[in-house]
């Protein structure tokens, strides 16, 4: 199922223009398309570099990212700084929690789990000083831990 969804989204991205992608990112983050395009241009990130799913969880804490991954990390850092989610190489977890609370209609136990994961991932990148590395590792940490939580909840049900 996961591979089917990945293939589906890859095909969608392949058929979408740069402007379409920038517009969707801007809309989901409540930013302007110009702000997103500025981050694309500033970091030299391209759509074909958006393969963060290829970075395995066990390599997340130990690896030195290749140039492509660094560009994507810098792109995420740029977006995060424009949105107020990051200041330099520091993640503003309280802002993220507030943003999630005000925009998502989740059950309290789901929010509690998500907030705990946000805190755990922030602790994992706290000692890092490179904003590109921080943003990429933080996002990947959150994705991996949320997926693991979701899988374990589905198994339990």
Stretches found by the model and what they are:
Residues 2-17:
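Cleavable N-terminal signal peptides of Sec/SRP-targeted secreted and luminal proteins
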Residues 13-157:
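Mature extracellular/luminal domains of secreted and GPI-anchored eukaryotic proteins, especially small
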């Amino acid at each position: 199922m996961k591979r089917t969804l990945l293939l589906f989204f890859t095909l969608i991205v392949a058929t979408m223009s740069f402007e379409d992608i920038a517009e969707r990112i801007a809309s989901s983050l409540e930013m302007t398309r110009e702000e997103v395009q500025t981050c694309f241009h500033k970091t030299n990130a391209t759509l074909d570099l958006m393969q963060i799913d290829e970075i395995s969880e066990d390599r997340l804490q130990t690896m030195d990212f290749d140039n492509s991954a660094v560009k994507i990390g810098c792109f995420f850092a740029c977006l995060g700084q424009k949105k107020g989610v990051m200041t330099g190489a520091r993640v503003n977890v309280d802002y993220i929690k507030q943003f999630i609370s005000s925009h998502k209609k989740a059950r309290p136990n789901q929010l509690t789990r998500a907030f705990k994961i946000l805190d755990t991932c922030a602790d994992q990148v706290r000692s890092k000083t490179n904003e590109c590395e921080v943003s990429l590792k933080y996002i990947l940490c959150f994705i991996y831990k949320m997926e693991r939580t979701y899988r374990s909840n589905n198994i339990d049900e």
